[in-house]
Amino acid sequence: MEKILQGNNILTDILWEPESLSYLDPGAQAAFRGMVKANRRLVYKDTSGHLAVGYCEKISTLYEPFAIYIKELFGDGIYFSHSDDNFTYLLIVNEGRIVSGTDCFIEREFFDELMRHPEQYEHLEVTLLTEVQLSVVIEKCHAHQLSLKRRRRFIISSILFGGIIFLALLALALHFLVAG
């Protein structure tokens, strides 16, 4: 799964800001404030309409956040996918908010231990991510990237066309000034 996502410029391991930073110690709060300055900011709305934020190291818009697509397409739940190298991808979406500390690959033993004690999230459905769900996310990401590419081309073409018109008008004005 990880290689498929990386091959399609889809990001995991994004650091999602918790709903409240007040329970964190001052060092962790300072680390989150430092991430605001150093990383790309990904913003979405949870089910109550509040803004939620994630931070990733890749600043290019060519990369899409996997967790936001899962949240938008499939809603609340505990999503996981086992890989061959004894790691498991884990994502928890609760009340439309991506839970901080998830959207990452963890050791399978740790995942199994977490699933034995799901008290805080026992109301959420546990879902194994399948190839079908991955392909839906990849398709949506490609469609979004295509629309971004079209918008970039339109903006660049508009600027180029505007520049050409400006230069033509400037040349015409200079011609009338010189010709008298």
Listing of model-derived features with the role each one plays in the protein:
Residues 1-125:
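Cytosolic/nucleoplasmic/matrix-facing N-terminal domains/tails
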Residues 87-88, 122-132, 170-175:
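Short secondary-structure transition/capping segments
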Residues 108-116, 134-135, 157-162:
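Short, surface-exposed, charge-dense and proline/glycine-enriched linear segments
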Residues 118-153:
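Juxtamembrane amphipathic/hinge helix adjacent to a transmembrane helix
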Residues 139-180:
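C-terminal single-pass membrane-anchor helix
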